[in-house]
Amino acid sequence: LIESRLKRKEHPDKKYFTFANTLATINYSKTVKGHGWMGCRFQTDPNKGYNEVIFHVRLNDNDAKLQQETIGIMGTNLIYGCFNYYNEPKKLIQSIYDNLSRDNVEMDMIHMEGPDFEGVDNRLLSLILVKENMTDAVIFGADGKNQQPSDVLYKKNILTIRGSFRPVTK
């Protein structure tokens, strides 16, 4: 929709971005924790296509107001990170957590794509989430794409076997 409304001929040097989130905070009776999706689509050059960063979060605070503040901080950090650290995906992920802790929020899935992220392996980004203590578990599908652990494991029987995976991307 935005691409059809923007007139590139009138604004050849402008870079555009969109930010979106779909989140639910904790309910009144505190039986359902907050969670949702956040993302940013942005250009680093007016003549390039757009890049996209999308991630899923679980909100850990026990107060809706605190969760809303956490969402605002994450959104601001995401936009800042997209424009300042797009060439360093690890730093971009770390910048999303500026002024936040795992006690506030857990990022359990992330996906980056676009012309500036062509060399980025999203599976490695998920492993960064584990390494940086932003989540406890990540899951890759058979196609190598990241999946949200809570969706994949919901109401499933699980067998865990200790092993090693070297290299993790093959």
Residue ranges and their predicted role:
Residues L1-P167:
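Non-catalytic terminal extensions that flank enzyme cores
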